[in-house]
Amino acid sequence: KDCSVWDDKGQEYLDLYGGHAVISIGHCHPHYVEALARQAAELGFYSNSVVNMLQRRLAERLGKACGYEDYQLFLINSGAEANENAMKLASFKTGRTRVLSAVKAFHGRTSLAVEATDNAKIIAPVNANGHVTYLPLNDLAAWEAELAKGDVCACIIECIQGVGGIRMATEEFAQGLQAACKRHGAVLVCDEIQCGYGRSGRFFAHQWLGIRPDLITVAKGIANGFPMGAVLISPDFKPEYGQLGTTFGGNHMACAAALAVLDVM
């Protein structure tokens, strides 16, 4: 409950972990519990072939809360899925296949997301496809040199690295990288999965750095533990019917959870 957890012997602990930065409004928040129970009693799931008004409400509410009202919202089930779809969109938009990621980055454990993660132990041979180049965070010259080659579809960064050791991008680097991406036709992706949703004192960590990325990925705190991920998509991306898809993403229960989180925040 709230910031406390108990073990099987009744010992209470102050939870400073939050389930790996997931519990954004506390355990068993009464408004959250009530919202999920109410939604489960009404409709737990239906296909995305039918318009889900909860998705529209969430897109509007989240856009206003984070300052990206003009961005589109694509909903999925996890952070890895969010990053997969962000990099997929970048490749569609640019027609390119190469990604720049930071040394010590963590972006997920699937397909291209794991290839963009700087940890050889979790990259299976089938995932090592040579699409990703790792560069030191805050070494702007190194990123500019790679972008100048003209084959990069996306630069993906955590503005505050989590697994990488709470290392923050500098304002000079972030703004310079954004300018270089625009200059060379690449897409800037900010992975806000762990550092976003108010965790840094602003809604997104990149908002301390004076940049406005093309794509923003979120998960973890978005639904307080209910599986959900999302990509906020710049209006520069023209929607194409059927380009992205998901069975469970943005389901009624997940949307109810995410809306309850925004209510409390």
Feature locations, PLM:
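Conserved N-terminal phosphate-binding loop of PLP-dependent enzymes in the Aspartate aminotransferase
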Residues: 1-265
